């Protein structure tokens, strides 16, 4: 009889303890009988894939996106931005055409995930003032890029009283711009309770299929479909903050190149 790590059923004349036979099910118990306690017994995390339920095996995302081929390539962007109340934008899908591990082979590739690492901070003069400043980040997909540079924050988002925390994509641009992820970070200035910098560490799965034209340069104007943009804006009108970020994208080349 195979050995199992789950709960067992004990019903003998000596012991009248009845324990539920559920074999470490992560779902909520429906019985009132006492169960054997264990460490992290409600999770399937540390169990091999063939011993997980069928739901975990069927609906698992593929390692390589559909229509793409390996290896997984990496492109990094290191930048320092002056984040103002009016907002700033950076294109994070700029990849040069080439044969290296950081280049795209052809016109099409898929960005599977993005890693945003860094911090936001204030300079010596601003951090002495009593205020709280929040930086709003919007990871946006531009489905139909047009022009030599991305549209500004105020051109894409509709805000109440010019407040970035109330920003939503304008109605006439909703079919073009899609907000995929949104997050924020907070810094506090003043003599008491100062938090002059805030660390950022975010990892998102995006699965964005980017299409370029015949040009080789990594520019926004060479995109034809699905440019990935990062919009940033701070909530304080007069005190800007600085963002020192390292943005890394993980992408796969398309088979149809």
UniProtKB/Swiss-Prot annotation:
One of its GO terms (biological process) is viral penetration into host nucleus. Keywords: Capsid protein, DNA-binding, Host nucleus, Metal-binding, T=1 icosahedral capsid protein, Viral penetration into host nucleus, Virion, Virus entry into host cell, Zinc, Zinc-finger. Its main location: virion. Signal peptide: none annotated. It comes from the Viruses. The keyword Zinc-finger applies. GO terms for molecular function: DNA binding; structural molecule activity; zinc ion binding. A motif (Bipartite nuclear localization signal) lies at residues 3-20, 201-248. It is found in: Virion; Host nucleus. A motif (Nuclear localization signal) lies at residues 40-54. A motif (Nuclear export signal) lies at residues 101-122. Coiled coil: none annotated. It holds the Pfam family Gemini_coat. This is Capsid protein.
């Amino acid at each position: 009889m195979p050995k199992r790590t789950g709960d067992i059923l004990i019903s003998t004349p000596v012991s009248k303890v009845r324990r539920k036979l559920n074999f470490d099910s992560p779902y909520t118990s429906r019985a009132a009988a006492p169960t054997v306690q264990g460490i992290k017994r409600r999770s399937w995390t540390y169990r091999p894939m063939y011993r997980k339920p069928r739901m975990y095996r069927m609906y698992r995302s593929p390692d390589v996106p559909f229509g793409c081929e390996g290896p997984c390539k990496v492109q990094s962007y290191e930048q320092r931005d002056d984040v103002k109340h009016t907002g700033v934008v950076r294109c994070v899908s700029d990849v040069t055409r080439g044969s290296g591990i950081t280049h795209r082979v052809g016109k099409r590739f898929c960005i599977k995930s993005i890693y945003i690492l860094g911090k936001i901070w204030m300079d010596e003069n601003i951090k002495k003032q009593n205020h709280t400043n929040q930086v709003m980040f919007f990871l946006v997909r531009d489905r139909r890029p047009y022009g030599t540079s991305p549209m500004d924050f105020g051109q894409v988002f509709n805000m109440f009283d010019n407040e970035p925390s109330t920003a939503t994509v304008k109605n006439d641009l909703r079919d073009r711009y899609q907000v995929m992820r949104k997050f924020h970070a907070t810094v506090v200035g003043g003599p008491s309770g100062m938090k002059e910098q805030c660390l950022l560490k975010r990892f998102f799965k995006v699965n964005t299929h980017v299409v370029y034209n015949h040009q080789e340069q990594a520019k926004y104007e060479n995109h034809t479909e699905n440019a990935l943009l990062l919009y940033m804006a701070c909530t304080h009108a007069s005190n800007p903050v600085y963002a020192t970020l390292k943005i890394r994208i993980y992408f796969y080349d398309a088979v149809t190149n």
